[in-house]
Regions:
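Sec-dependent N-terminal signal peptides of Gram-positive bacterial secreted proteins and lipoproteins
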Residues: 2-25, 305-325
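Serine-esterase "nucleophile elbow" of acetyl-processing enzymes
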Residues: 26-82, 98-102, 262
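Conserved catalytic region of serine esterases and O-acyltransferases that act on ester linkages
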Residues: 30, 196, 222, 228-243, ...
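Short, solvent-exposed loop/turn and secondary-structure capping segments
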Residues: 47-51, 89-90, 121-124
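Surface-exposed patches in mature extracellular/periplasmic domains of secreted proteins
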Residues: 71-81, 193, 238-240, 279-280
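Structural motif
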Residues: 83-95
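Alpha-helical cap/lid subdomain in secreted, periplasmic
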Residues: 97-254, 258, 262-273
Length: 334
């Protein structure tokens, strides 16, 4: 009888530890982090000028918000690079194994591309029209040089407008298709992709003559390419072109300031679905934490539905111990 009781207690103890161990990490096992990957240029990176800390970019804000609303943790990876145009995007970023591995596990992919294609074309055109060997580092630098030359030769404006108007959109579309082919081949079928379209990066600059309208037309054509390919590749367009982002830019007149980044985050977030709980945001019991920042020490988080089993096993163990104690007392009196 005594051996049977001991075995019962031992068995109950093993079961208790097994269930308790499962309960302790149930939340972690059943709640995979949301994986967000950001690709693109300096806008997606959160550029804030040379030798200055980067802004809190829109991708980070979106990651935190959807994780919070879903009550999950998140893994956020940003592969954006300053000055990146679509050709370099394909050659220097998307061919990387690390990037492709990240895309294969991503739940949400955010992409901002295209502005540098336009700006690079503007710099190239300015260099050719001005017949200079100077390689402009920025569109702002090129614009200042153009403005200076136009003062003495107003006809230069028409040459620049003509050159920009004849830009080869086919090259941009070809590179964009290649990029989306790569991303589509890497991503999970259910992954969501949001692409920001292009806002006028020189709207706040005082362009000579009617050049600003030409730039607007070019941007419109580029955005139509992005829109045309959206159904084919299954991505959503976050419309920055018709937003107030250009009202929230840095001193360079191009890159968004923090308010601009926050506005982009709001527009992008509206295109992402499936991360809402059936409760108000204020009642969400999850905390958005980067996976790599989760403390190594595990905290016991027993799921409510497991408490009943744990209590029953505890009762069995306690009953077994009392039974043994009673038997010992009876044996002493004999």
């Amino acid at each position: 009888m005594r051996k049977t009781a001991v075995r019962a207690v031992a068995l109950a103890a093993v079961c208790f530890l097994s269930v308790f161990g499962t309960c302790s990490y149930a939340k972690e096992a059943t709640s995979e982090p949301i994986q967000i990957v950001v690709l693109g240029d300096s806008i997606a990176k959160g550029y804030c000028g040379a030798n200055k800390p980067e802004l809190y970019c829109y991708g980070q804000t979106v990651a935190e918000e959807i994780a919070q609303r879903a009550g999950k943790s998140y893994m956020y990876q940003n592969y954006a690079n300053n000055g990146l145009a679509t050709r370099e995007f394909n050659e220097k970023v998307l061919k990387g194994q690390e990037v492709q591995d990240s895309l294969s596990g991503a739940d949400v992919i955010l992409i901002t591309m295209g502005s540098n294609d336009l700006l690079n074309e503007f710099k190239k055109t300015a260099q050719e029209i001005l017949n200079t060997d100077t390689k402009f580092k920025s569109a702002d630098e090129a614009l200042k040089e153009v403005t200076e030359h136009v003062k003495s030769n107003p006809l230069l404006v028409f040459r620049i407008i003509d050159a920009l108007g004849n830009w080869d959109y086919q090259e941009f579309e070809t590179q964009w298709i290649e990029a989306m082919d790569t991303i589509s081949s890497c991503k999970k079928e259910e992954a969501q992709i949001v692409v920001t379209n292009i806002y006028n990066p020189v709207k706040q600059m005082e362009l000579p003559g009617t050049m600003n309208q030409v730039v607007e037309d070019i941007i419109g054509n580029m955005n139509r390419i992005l829109e045309k390919r959206s159904s084919e590749y299954g991505y959503q367009i976050a419309d920055l072109a018709n937003s107030q982002v250009t009202e929230h830019v840095q001193k360079d007149g191009l890159h968004p300031d923090q308010a601009g980044q926050d506005l982009i985050a709001e527009i992008v977030r509206a295109q992402i679905t499936g991360y809402e709980r059936n409760m108000p945001k204020s009642q969400v019991d999850g905390t958005a934490v980067k996976v790599e920042e989760i403390p190594e020490e595990k905290q016991s988080q027993i799921r409510p539905e497991k408490w009943g089993i744990c209590l029953i096993l505890a009762a069995v163990m306690l009953g077994g111990v009392r039974f043994l104690q009673k038997n010992r007392k009876e044996n002493r009196h004999k």
